[in-house]
């Protein structure tokens, strides 16, 4: 059952033109936009899907935000992995409840959030980030989404190659690094035989170097692909593709660890 909105949680406000706004609700707070002002108290205590009028007479509809809404509107230290790529990563890296996942490149934590939600409380995510400023923003974004750093997540400052010294073992590894071929030896040692490695890379040069290195580092069944998202405009009179589409954001390279 969907509970009424409470102070301290986020609401997604949808205006009549389809624009969305992510708002942290506070008693006595006020939302300001081109659509006018709306007191947070008008939202608090009401269920999702409630339609409200601003001081200018514009209608806003309040929903709880989806993960994709958080990702698109979160503050960024590093470039985020977009929703159109998050889904394929979770699918092709075979992230499942209870999985032990190694992540390198926490960045703004969009992918980290998706991993933590998918593995659940019975799973484990260990995420490395070499840049202090990115880790600081990641912690804020994780706290904003979960309310705290989730119990199944360990955040570590430093290079993912340091995992070799821990003796830990993982079933899956997800990389968002500019040079993912560098720590392959350490990652091979940390992955279980048959484990999945999935790397997110923006350029073909990076992909080529990684794919050429993977067989020499104990990986096989290598696949590379990208996902494109094209929206459609549907009305009574016509059905046509949108004038704009979300094209290239990054490539995914997936491989399996040999014994």
Can you name each region flagged by the protein language model?
Residues 108-121, 188-189:
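Conserved SAM-binding loop of SAM-dependent methyltransferases across substrates and taxa
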Residues 184-251:
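C-terminal substrate-binding/active-site "lid" region of AdoMet-derived donor-dependent transferases
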Residues 91-96, 118, 146-147, 164, ...:
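Glycine-rich helix-loop-beta junction characteristic of Rossmann-like nucleotide cofactor-binding loops
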Residues 1-64:
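N-terminal auxiliary segments of SAM/dcSAM-dependent transferases
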Residues 128-180:
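S-adenosyl-L-methionine
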Residues 2-3, 73-86:
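Conserved SAM-binding loop and adjacent beta-strand
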Residues 99, 123, 195:
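Glycine-centered, small-residue-biased loops immediately flanking beta-strands
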Residues 96-107:
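Conserved class I S-adenosyl-L-methionine
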């Amino acid at each position: 059952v969907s509970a009424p909105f409470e102070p301290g949680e986020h609401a997604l406000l949808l205006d009549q033109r389809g624009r969305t706004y992510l708002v942290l609700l506070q008693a006595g707070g006020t939302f300001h936009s081109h659509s006018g002002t709306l007191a947070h108290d008008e939202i608090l205590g009401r269920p999702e899907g409630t339609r409200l009028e601003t001081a200018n007479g514009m209608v806003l509809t309040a929903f709880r935000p989806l993960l994709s809404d958080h990702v698109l509107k979160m503050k960024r230290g590093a470039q985020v992995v977009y929703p159109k790529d998050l889904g394929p990563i979770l699918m092709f890296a075979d992230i499942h409840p209870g999985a032990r996942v190694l992540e390198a490149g926490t960045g703004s934590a969009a992918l980290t959030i998706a991993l933590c939600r998918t593995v659940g409380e019975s799973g484990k995510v260990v995420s490395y980030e070499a840049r202090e400023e990115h880790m600081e923003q990641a912690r804020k974004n994780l706290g904003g989404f979960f309310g705290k750093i989730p119990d199944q997540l360990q955040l570590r400052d430093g290079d993912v190659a340091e995992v070799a010294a821990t003796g830990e073992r993982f079933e899956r590894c997800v990389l968002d690094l500019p040079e993912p071929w560098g720590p392959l030896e350490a990652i091979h040692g940390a992955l279980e035989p048959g484990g999945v490695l999935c790397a997110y890379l923006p350029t073909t040069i990076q992909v080529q170097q990684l794919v050429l290195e993977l067989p020499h580092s104990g990986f096989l069944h290598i696949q590379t692909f990208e996902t494109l998202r094209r929206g459609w405009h549907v009305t009574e009179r016509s059905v046509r593709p949108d004038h704009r589409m979300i094209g290239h954001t990054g490539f995914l390279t997936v491989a399996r660890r040999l014994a």
